[in-house]
Structures are given as structure tokens and as C-alpha cells.
Amino acid sequence: MRGGTVQINWHEQQPVLTLDFHPVSRRLATGGSDHDIKIWVIASDDSDKKLPTATYHSSLSSHSSAVNVLRFSPSGENLASGADGGGIIIWKLHSTDDGEAWKVQKTLLFHHKDVLDLQWSQDGAFLVSASVDNSCIVWDAIKGSVQQKLEGHLHYVQGVAWDPLGQYIASLSSDRTCRIYANKPQGKSKNTDRMNFVCQHTLVKAEHQNHDESKPPVRAHLFHDETLPSFFRRLAWSPDGSFLVLPAGLCKYSSEVINTAYVMSRRDLSRPAIQLPGASKAIVAVRFCPVLFKLRGSQSDCFFKLPYRVIFAVATLNSLYVYDTESVAPILIHAGLHYAAITDIAWSSDAKYLAVSSRDCFCTIIEFENEELGLPYNLSGTKELDEGNTNCENMKPLKVDSMEIDAGSSKAKIKASSAAVEVTPSPPVLAQNNILMTKDVAEGNATSENDRPSAVDNMEVDVGENKAKMEVTPVAVQVTAPPVSTKNSASSKPTKKRITPIAIN
């Protein structure tokens, strides 16, 4: 693995707000505050020590304001982009004598204010968008018409995700709620059920155990409020639709506030099943690797009982975590990436590259070696998921040491012996920034507190009627210096936090 910040003029020294890889080729599309969409060709450098290269290919210049989000359709034939002011453009790929060109196919105008996020349906026939006007809109991408308007949020809708199995749409807002809409067709039109999404669950608060056992559990908000310093809360479904990961999570233990992401099991979307704490800054984006991987160990070693491994990236305002469902701890931590907030993340279709965009006008590209993440798994053999039957054993999380977490039951349970259980996650891969390293870190002589694991008090988790005490061993995160910048900015080194996923009420 290698990677770092690619120092080229991405968007005329303007913030890069979004990016996405083409599902077939290694084209990378980026959108920024300069009103343009740019297409880049990503390639590996022959030298082992150099970063991947990004070569400019073309520009798409029909927006008149900042481009906040862009996503390729599953087939790669179309590209949808949303901008300030509420405009959405659907671009279509055309073959030309010079190679290829993207031309405007549809312009979708219905949102009254900025579009912050959007997502294609799995068949590429529909599109859902999220806006500052507090609503989501389901579009017929072929006709360019409004299919349905989803209302209910009381503040900006900053993230939206369409279930790959087509049954759910999830939206996340700065009103501190996540709404899960289920498709309940109302009738038939030309022998085809007309989709109709109805709000099935609204996630607002959850019960957190009080450290003082004499006091009852406290109900607290699950998500950050509108003071979160980001316009984006990009949530995501796993490629198989088995679970949903929500960013912008907030968990309060006594006086300590912990940033977290929530994992939702498809079997029970009314409450989070697992939380991923540990980030020093708020989590703003989640993106799943489109490739599923074969198990490296036995199935009983996995955190989720799935016949394959799912890998996903979680971006905070200043760092990147990569998780594997076969591992409790992150398999990769990349900190100190940028001088300003991270805005979006994207995987290439072959899992070769992971890209990150930032408001500091630059993008980071991480390249993985062949089979570094594992051997690809063919999902076509999983009949239950293909048919949408998710009430199977594959959806039940497995034991983590002496803990058994059942995310699908009405109440998550933790079974443990009366003695404390020591959970020691394997160390994650520590990413190195190839642009510049401080001398102490480069020589392995770092002496700052941030470079040493600190003692962590025993953490009590009370879920349902059973109690489990865990002594969690923190993982040291080595932080290397980012590229030298002439801009004044505060250090983005994250402090050490607990990063072991735990079950919650």
C-alpha cells in the first residue's frame, strides 16, 4: 500500500467538494467550488516510492455554482451531479473521434436550495437527492421527472443512500435524525408497481448506560446537531445490502463526548446494532468498497456472520479509517491527511484505489497492491441476498471473544463471564505519507504523547440485563506530517480514542 496527497491543481485552487470513480474504467470525477466537474485518469507510477498519478482528461462546465456531489450510475453510462441553488444535471457518455465526451442529457429542477447528496438506484433508472430545503426527491432519471418527494426532516438533509436491493432509502439530516423509508407500492401502472416510499423508522435518541450504576440509563441524541462543521453526512449501504453505516454519530459517556459511526443491521433498522467510536473529529462520510472478499480465517472469527468480508472507509474531518468485517479494529488509519475538512471518499471498481477529497483544494489517493485486501468473492452464489431474503443466519453477528452480539434481536445482548475480558485488537496498518515526514517519526523516535498508547480505564457496557466489563487496549496511531502548506492551520493530529466497536442499546 502507498499513497498520499497528489499535489496538482485540481480545481483552480478551490475546495474539492466531491469525487467518484467510474464503475468500469479508472476515471475519477471531481467536483469543486469552481463550478466545474473534472475527469481524471488515475494510474500507478512505475517507481515504488512515488504516488499514483492523476492525469487531466476533460471538464464538464454546465453548472453555475459549486458542485457538492456527483455519482456515476451503476452502468457507467450516466453521471449525476448536484450543485448549489438546487440544480441537478444528468450527463451521458458519448463516443467521439477523440475518444469520449460527457454531454448534458437532463436537467432536474425542483429543489429550492442547494443539493448536498444524491444516489442512484441499483438499476440506474431512478435517482434520489438530498437538499438544504429539508427534503429528498426521488427522480425518474429516464424521464427527468419527479417520482416522489420525501418530507419530514426539520433541517438540512445532508446525506442520502439507496438500498442496493431497492427496498429502502435512508436519509440523514442536521436535525439530528435519520429517517428510513420503505418502498410500499400503491398500485400498478402499465403492469409495473409504482414505487411509494413511506417513513418506517426515525432514529433520534438511544439509551446509554450511566457510569454510575445507581443512576438509570440516559436517553441521548444519536447524532451531532447543526453546529457540525460540515455540509455533508454521507451515509452508505454495504454492496450486498446487509447493513447500513451512519456517520455524524455522537455518544456521551458521563462528561465525555465520543464521535462515532453507527452500524445498522438490515434485520432491524429501528436502532443501531454497533457503534464504531474512536475518532477525534466528527465523522462526515462513509463509503463501501464495491468488491467483496473471501474470508481469510474461519467464519467464526468474523465480527459479522457473513460468508465473505466487507470493507468500508470512514472519513472524519481530518482522518481516514478503513474497516474490515473480519476484524474488530480498523485495518488502516490514515491521519493528518489535509489542512482542511475532508468532504468525500470513493473506491475504484477494482478496489485498487481509495480517493479522498478536501476543502484544502487537494485530493489524496491511496493505492493497494494486488490481493493486499484479499481475494475477490463472487456474490452471485448467495441466493438469499440476491432474492432479498435477509432473514438468514448470515445476518447474525458472531461472538467477539466471549461476547455474543445479536444485532437483529429486539435487544442486543452481551454474554460474558463475571471476570473482565481483555480484548486486544490486532494493530492496524499504519499509513505513511510519502510527501514529507518529521525526523522523529521517520526515525521511529517520536516522543509526543500522541505517539504513545495511553492507559484507558475499564469500560463498562450495560446492554439489556447482562453486563460485560472490557479492558480495551488502545491502538497507537502513528501520525506523519502532511505536505507543507503556506496556509495557517491548526494541527489535525487526532488524539487517541477507543476504537473497538461495541454493542449498544
Swiss-Prot record:
Main location per UniProt?
nucleus
Q: Does the keyword Transcription regulation apply?
A: yes
SMART domains attached here? WD40
Q: What residue spans do the WD repeats cover?
A: 11-50, 62-101, 110-149, 152-191, 223-268, 278-333, 337-378
Q: Name one GO cellular component term.
A: CAF-1 complex
Q: Which InterPro entries did the record assign?
A: CAF1B_HIR1_beta-prop, Gprotein_B, PTHR15271, WD40/YVTN_repeat-like_dom_sf, WD40_repeat_dom_sf, WD40_rpt
Q: Which UniProt keywords apply?
A: Chromatin regulator, DNA damage, DNA recombination, DNA repair, Nucleus, Repeat, Transcription, Transcription regulation, WD repeat
According to its UniProt entry, the protein's GO biological process terms are:
DNA replication-dependent chromatin assembly; double-strand break repair via homologous recombination; heterochromatin formation; leaf development; meristem structural organization; nucleosome assembly; pollen development; trichome differentiation
Region of interest called Disordered, as start-end residue ranges on this chain: 479-505
Pfam hit, one: Beta-prop_CAF1B_HIR1
The answer to keyword Ion transport applying to this record is no
Q: Where is the signal peptide?
A: none
Record localization: Nucleus
PROSITE patterns hit by this protein = WD_REPEATS_1 (PS00678), WD_REPEATS_2 (PS50082), WD_REPEATS_REGION (PS50294)
How it assembles, according to the record, is:
Component of the chromatin assembly factor 1 (CAF-1) complex, composed of FSM (FAS1), FAS2 and MSI1.
Instruction: Family membership, please give it.
Output: Belongs to the WD repeat HIR1 family.
Q: What does this protein do?
A: Component of the chromatin assembly factor complex (CAF-1) involved in chromatin assembly following DNA replication and DNA repair. Required for several aspects of development, including apical meristem maintenance by regulating the durations of the S- and G2-phases of the cell cycle through its chromatin assembly activity.
Supply the name of the protein.
Chromatin assembly factor 1 subunit FAS2 homolog
Q: List the source organism.
A: Oryza sativa subsp. japonica (Rice)
